[in-house]
Structure formats: C-alpha cells, structure tokens
C-alpha cells in the first residue's frame, strides 16, 4: 500500500472536507483516478499535504531540473512540521473538466495560522 495509507484511515473524513476519504481523495492519491477539475486537484493536494502523501504531491506538481530526492525530503519535513486543520475554497474561476486552466482561491488553516492563496492550475 502506498505511503500514508491504511484500511482504517480510509473510513475517516477527508482532510479536504469533501466527504469520506476513501470516496473523496484516496482514489486520486492511489492513482486510480485523475482530478477532473482545478478544485478537485486543489482539494486532493491539500489532502495530500495533510496526510503526507508525498508521492502524489511530487506527481501533481513536477519541477523539472530539481532533484526529486531533495524535493521529497523537503516535503516530508514540511508535512511533518505542519498540522493542517481545514480548507475553505473561496472562489473558482474556470478549471472545469473541459477547461485548459483554472484558478482556485483558498484558505488552508493550520496550527500556526492561515495560508491564503490563489493558485493557477493548467
């Protein structure tokens, strides 16, 4: 089973707030399904940060020219240091299943405060 997965954890609510994890972001994290919208990708990435699904984070945000081992170590450190508490989607522009790109404005709450961001997904 990929990192971060256990059968019992699948029954819990998804960190992104979209329902039960096994029906929400788990299929994306396991590579059984791809995100169909910018919002779904945003939610799945938030969930991956909250669950330390580093493989998924690397796969969904490639950085050519950067060493994957270094990126993996940075992500593991970041995930281990941050306690994510919740996600609020503020606005979605485009990013539907037929769109080439979309933007998602969100707030990701963590123990140290709130990350407010508008991300472009292509």
Kindly label every feature range from the protein language model.
Residues 2, 116-122:
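Short beta-strand edge/turn micro-motifs at domain boundaries
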Residues 9, 97, 118-120:
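Alpha-helical solenoid repeat scaffolds of the TPR/TPR-like class and their adjacent stem/linker regions
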Residues 78-114:
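Surface-exposed, charged secondary-structure patches
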Residues 43-48, 54-56, 60:
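Internal catalytic or translocation cores that form aromatic/hydrophobic pockets or channels
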Residues 40, 44-49, 73-81:
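N-terminal short leaders/motifs
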Residues 29, 50, 62, 94, ...:
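Residue-level marker of positions within ordered structural domains that often coincide
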Residues 1-44, 51:
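Short, low-complexity N-terminal intrinsically disordered segments enriched in polar/charged residues
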Residues 55, 59-89:
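Short solvent-exposed beta->alpha transition segments
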């Amino acid at each position: 089973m990929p990192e971060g997965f256990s059968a019992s954890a699948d029954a819990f609510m998804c960190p992104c707030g979209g329902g039960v994890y096994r029906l929400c972001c788990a299929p994306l994290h396991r590579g059984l399904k791809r995100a169909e919208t910018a919002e779904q990708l945003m939610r799945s990435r938030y969930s991956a940060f909250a669950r330390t699904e580093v493989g998924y984070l690397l796969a969904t945000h490639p950085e050519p020219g950067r060493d994957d081992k270094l990126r993996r170590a940075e992500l593991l450190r970041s995930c281990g240091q941050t306690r994510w508490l919740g996600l609020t989607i503020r606005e979605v522009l485009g990013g539907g299943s037929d769109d080439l790109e979309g933007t998602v404005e969100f707030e990701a709450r963590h123990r140290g405060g709130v990350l407010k961001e508008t991300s472009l997904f292509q």
